[in-house]
């Protein structure tokens, strides 16, 4: 779970530092994918009793919110054709 969460922020940072639209989009999409991976790992952790129901709900909501924000960022970049930070 830690690796997936770290991958989200690392890919956002790397995408932010890229100049080309395609590179930015690629890293933001990778970050979003890591968010979905984290959601799966949270479910497995709950199912194997490594997380309580309360912890699962809180962490899943944070992950969903982050994933939605990333989706909006990607949509905005595509819609506006932004190529700079």
Predicted regions mapped to residue ranges:
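Amphipathic alpha-helical assembly/interaction segments
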Residues: 2-85
């Amino acid at each position: 779970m830690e690796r997936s969460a770290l991958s989200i922020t690392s890919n956002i940072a790397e995408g932010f530092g890229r100049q080309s639209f395609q590179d930015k989009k690629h890293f933001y999409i990778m970050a979003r994918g890591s968010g979905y991976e984290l959601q799966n790992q949270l479910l497995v952790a709950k199912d194997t009793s490594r997380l309580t129901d309360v912890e699962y709900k809180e962490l899943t909501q944070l992950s969903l919110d982050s994933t939605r924000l990333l989706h909006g960022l990607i949509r905005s970049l595509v819609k506006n054709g932004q190529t700079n930070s």
